[in-house]
């Protein structure tokens, strides 16, 4: 059976062979997202309860166990009764998602960005473009208001913004400045406070033969 792949760079998803798996309700997806965020580490049951509810109901522990059972059936539908789970496992005081590094889009994205830094400059733009293409929307989109996603959402978003700017900078250095301009324009329309992006845009315009536009950017 093919591996299950997970997405958190946008709405939380799980797929097998390109087919979406039914994850039931928002709290099921919240449990899955919280385990993905933990990066294969165990999340104690009481921590899951605190993260899912501001004021946990009396049967919150049982509810989390039900959510986990439902998720296991969705992720491993062919697992024999009473056989231990291989993907969403019970360990010590809680649960962990033992997904492979390539099976979570956020993990693949980070690995690709790191790889681009090691590649020859001529190969780096394509690698960064492929990495950025994995984003389908804001990270952990449906849980943007949750305290437990805040730090990771901020970190991933900053990594994405830097990847856009780094790709443009490399294109300029390679003499492909005109290719960098449209992406930087779109980037700065959405994130106008990015000073480094303005600097790279001014340089890209200048190198592309649009000196007046480049100077206008610097004078903004």
Could you describe each region identified by the protein language model?
Residues 1-3:
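Intrinsically disordered or compositionally simple regulatory linkers and C-terminal tails
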Residues 8-29:
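A structural micro-motif at secondary-structure boundaries
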Residues 13, 34, 42, 70:
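Short, surface-exposed polybasic/aromatic micro-patch for ligand or macromolecular engagement
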Residues 21-22, 26, 34-40, 53-61, ...:
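Intrinsically disordered, charged and Pro/Gly-enriched terminal/linker segments
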Residues 42-50:
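Short acidic, hydrophobic short linear motifs in intrinsically disordered regions
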Residues 48, 71, 131:
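Residue-level signal for inorganic ion chemistry
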Residues 59-70:
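Short amphipathic alpha-helical interaction segments
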Residues 68, 72-79:
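C-terminal flanking helix
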